[in-house]
Swiss-Prot record:
A ubiquinone binds at residue 201. The chain crosses the membrane at residues 33-53, 77-98, 113-133, 178-198, 226-246, 288-308, 320-340, 347-367. Pfam families: Cytochrom_B_C, Cytochrome_B. Heme 1 (or BL or b562) is low-potential and absorbs at about 562 nm, and heme 2 (or BH or b566) is high-potential and absorbs at about 566 nm. The cytochrome bc1 complex contains 11 subunits: 3 respiratory subunits (MT-CYB, CYC1 and UQCRFS1), 2 core proteins (UQCRC1 and UQCRC2) and 6 low-molecular weight proteins (UQCRH/QCR6, UQCRB/QCR7, UQCRQ/QCR8, UQCR10/QCR9, UQCR11/QCR10 and a cleavage product of UQCRFS1). This cytochrome bc1 complex then forms a dimer. InterPro entries: Cyt_b/b6_C, Cyt_b/b6_C_sf, Cyt_b/b6_N, Cytb/b6-like_sf, Cytochrome_b, Cytochrome_b_C_euk/bac, Cytochrome_b_N_euk/bac, Di-haem_cyt_TM. This is Cytochrome b. It comes from Akodon lutescens puer. Component of the ubiquinol-cytochrome c reductase complex (complex III or cytochrome b-c1 complex) that is part of the mitochondrial respiratory chain. The b-c1 complex mediates electron transfer from ubiquinol to cytochrome c. Contributes to the generation of a proton gradient across the mitochondrial membrane that is then used for ATP synthesis.
């Protein structure tokens, strides 16, 4: 078996990626989230496949087909709630994974980092088009509001929006194409995830100390396969508790009402995962400015390798930047809270302050703290 594993053309790739892979001996549980994201993707594709067997992407039947899945299909309610809450778990793991990458300086592996940003954006796009499919009130108005943002693009904006809609409003054509996108994008994500791993294994994993670990590597199996398995069981436990006891806690009550173009909800709020970006968008009075800020709030991650001037790898021995990092996490939580609040005083002002702080931390404060710490080392 050992000879086959090392010599067979297909098994050799798996062996070098998951069995005999040299891994730093000191990576902590924060490194578990990569495998958890892989697990989330598998759960989403499998549950999504079964949902697609019973769902119809037509404005007249979409809402009732989701009700039919929950009422008449064997364990349809469970498949649907695993899919809906699995998406939330996916984003929680994604945010922790990115947060860990920033904290431990994984952005210096620039190819892996940039493909990670593409994965992040693709996942957000997939979640958005998926949120439209149940064709409830929030699905319809969320689709209308978010796609309308493209009309802020000069010259081609309005034409682009109508092209995406497939008409003059969000309608049957929009729903059908969103279903097509939602079906294909997870497979594109899976392909990018493999490229992400390919580039990671070119350089080897980072580790909490930020030091070179070439002299202290251990095989991935059995040490980290066991560790990942524990993480996966814990993830499944949380997911099952969510799906079985609190299935609708992360959803929106408006989505229990079928889509009605004549009746607008009190305030359209996106899914919990993208609220921080939505809060940044709303903080800027100008439409085009808001859209640019929304895009930059994600693309700012691509600036981390460029703005990094520190002589040290990661924040483990950098107390000044650690304080700024945790302030940024708190800032992100404030933005997430603001995104779900109505557009009125004091929420608008808090949102504007938090948005300015968000960009200031990443573009000004972290590079300044890098310089301060480099000078402290010289002393």
């Amino acid at each position: 078996m050992k000879i086959l594993r090392k010599n067979h053309p297909l098994l050799k790739i798996i062996n070098h990626s998951f069995i005999d892979l040299p891994t730093p001996s000191n990576i902590s549980s924060w490194w578990n989230f990569g495998s958890l994201l892989g697990m989330c993707l598998v759960i989403q594709i499998l549950t999504g496949l079964f949902l697609a067997m019973h769902y119809t992407s037509d404005t007249t039947t979409a809402f009732s087909s989701v009700a039919h899945i929950c009422r008449d299909v064997n364990y349809g309610w469970l498949i649907r709630y695993l899919h809906a809450n699995g998406a939330s778990m996916f984003f929680i793991c994604l945010f922790i994974h990115v947060g860990r990458g920033i904290y431990y300086g994984s952005y210096v592996l620039s190819e892996t980092w940039n493909i990670g940003i593409i994965l992040f954006l693709t996942t957000m796009a997939t979640a958005f088009v998926g949120y439209v499919l149940p064709w409830g009130q929030m699905s319809f108005w969320g689709a209308t509001v978010i796609t309308n943002l493209l009309s802020a693009i000069p010259y081609i904006g309005s034409t682009l929006v109508e092209w995406i809609w497939g008409g003059f409003s969000v309608d049957k054509a929009t729903l059908t194409r969103f279903f097509a996108f939602h079906f294909i994008l997870p497979f594109i994500i899976a392909a990018f995830a493999l490229v992400h791993l390919l580039f990671l294994h070119e350089t080897g994993s980072n580790n909490p100390s930020g030091l070179n670990s070439d002299s202290d590597k251990i095989p991935f199996h059995p040490y980290y396969t066991t560790k990942d398995l524990l993480g996966i069981f814990l993830l499944l436990l949380v997911l099952m508790i969510l799906a079985l006891f609190f299935p609708d806690i992360l959803g929106d009550p408006d989505n229990f009402t079928p889509a009605n173009p004549l009746n607008t909800p009190a305030h359209x709020x996106p899914x919990x995962x993208x609220l921080f970006a939505y809060a940044i968008l709303r903080s800027i009075p100008n439409k085009l400015g808001g859209v640019l800020a929304l895009i930059l709030s994600i693309l700012i991650l691509a600036a981390f390798p460029l703005l990094n001037t520190s002589k040290q790898h990661g924040l483990i021995f950098r107390p000044v930047t650690q304080v700024i990092y945790w302030x940024x996490i708190a800032n992100l939580l404030v933005l997430t809270w603001i995104g779900g609040q109505p557009v009125e005083y004091p929420f608008t002002m808090i949102g504007q302050i938090a948005s300015i702080t968000y960009f200031a931390i990443x573009i000004i404060l972290i590079p300044v703290s890098n310089t301060i710490e480099n000078n402290i080392i010289k002393l």
